[in-house]
Amino acid sequence: MTIEFDRPGAHVTAADHRALMSLFPTGVAVITAIDEAGTPHGMTCTSLTSVTLDPPTLLVCLNRASGTLHAVRGGRFGVNLLHARGRRAAEVFSTAVQDRFGEVRWEHSDVTGMPWLAEDAHAFAGCVVRKSTVVGDHEIVLGEVHEVVREHDLPLLYGMREFAVWTPEG
């Protein structure tokens, strides 16, 4: 499939940018948080990266209209890195399902108390918000990692608008 972009120097549309980023495969995460009323919120996210090792910090980019972002602004959030069998969770948390947490098994993490999708995530990071900044229609949230849970499993990937599974050589 050939994707054509505007000529250099021309205005880049949201569709152009989305098509470009679809060519960059990445892992799939579900960002979780609990609002002031104790209600869990979550959304599928592929805009996640490590920032620094000292202190251990990562960033996520969340849509400003997201209910999950509102809960994250409470000061803590969880990052659930989905394993190869976590596609259903990725789909549930990327749609307008009313009770997303009723569709998956989850529990409160030990240190931060954030929702951990224990059956769908091969890794979990509990984070404390250190800084956030608005850029366009998204907010970049920097979280200092205070908790890590890991299991050995193959990650779920997303690229070219499709889910895939890592298949290591060897």
From Swiss-Prot:
Domain of life: Bacteria
Assigned EC number: 1.5.1.30
Originating gene: rbmH
Gene3D superfamilies xref list: Electron Transport, Fmn-binding Protein, Chain A
Name this protein carries in UniProt: Flavin reductase (NADPH)
Swiss-Prot/TrEMBL catalytic activity: reduced riboflavin + NADP(+) = riboflavin + NADPH + 2 H(+)
Molecular functions per Gene Ontology: FMN binding; riboflavin reductase (NADPH) activity
Disulphide bonds in the chain: none
Family that this chain belongs to: Belongs to the non-flavoprotein flavin reductase family.
Record's function text: Catalyzes the NADH-dependent reduction of FAD to provide FADH2 for the halogenase RebH.
UniProt KW keywords: NADP, Oxidoreductase
Entries under Pfam families matching the protein: Flavin_Reduct
